[in-house]
């Protein structure tokens, strides 16, 4: 039924007159070639009967963008990597979920991926040298496309079906995908009724697509993950000590941000302005805790760049004008973040040294994730009137090692400098570092380390004359 509807839509668009046809010509001095939400009169995509047909026009040497996180179009990636005739294909994306056949050992030599942020499906490929990692602030990724620093020939997207006027949406993942849709010469999309229709910067007109594949494939969903006792304790500390009524929250990905959300049920008039949102916001909205009453940007609404969670989260987003899904260059703009009074930024870390340097993207030399938006929000929250910047982590790693260290591991990537860091939280309390000396920082950090590690940390710090 949906295929018939899409084919009918394509035929209708081809019959449309040529009045006010938006141009695909590049904007002056930029790599932008289209406004994705503008209708192209007389144009319509090719309706592909299979994923193989949808990507059949992609040539060797093509530079391909892959839609982010929950929207990763696995069917198209699988079809692309089945193309034994292709060589020298370069793929670019941030974190994607699901299978990553383009980074498998079998694809090496024909496909090379530039990861602007890593998910679990990319770590082995980067560690083994089959794929690359680019350290970059998430806020700056759209400009890499728009300035032509990372040219794109094709964007592989997953979008919602067109409405009566031909408008599809980027659903739960506007983030860097809008910029890619503006700049890629060709747009290929999986069109699925499982994609929520969202508001904000999400619109892509059906006529801007070059090829479409009808599919009922659901968006990738986050697997359930039980929070540890340490995660829950950290959530309580942050909620009770650092989040006031009327605050606006930014929360990163992971167990700790979700634990924080669970501990906010008694707060009032909170707002959400965040690069990402997860299931935890739903209950707070339904309980009337999140109202956005004090937000400057999109008052009364949630602002986010992407969403990743359960099917319930995607259903919550569908046709929900209370959520504005925005370009990540907008959401993560430091000046815009700073303009929101009472902005509380909560991000996690892999390891922090006793001076406050945050490693959040690697385990030693092994890349684990990426820079992302932590620094964007850390700085923005610090500049916000009444803002609070929080870096949170359990005191111990899974192997029992201290995650608060005297010196970061060799090769560790410093994502957030010690000058940026304001508050560090473990299950043992809060270390307020802003304006404090190295000696004072060392004492504060050791005080929130695991009790079994404090003597060891103190001795090592004294040996280095940090105490």
Model segments located where?
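Conserved alpha/beta enzyme-core scaffold
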Residues: 3-467
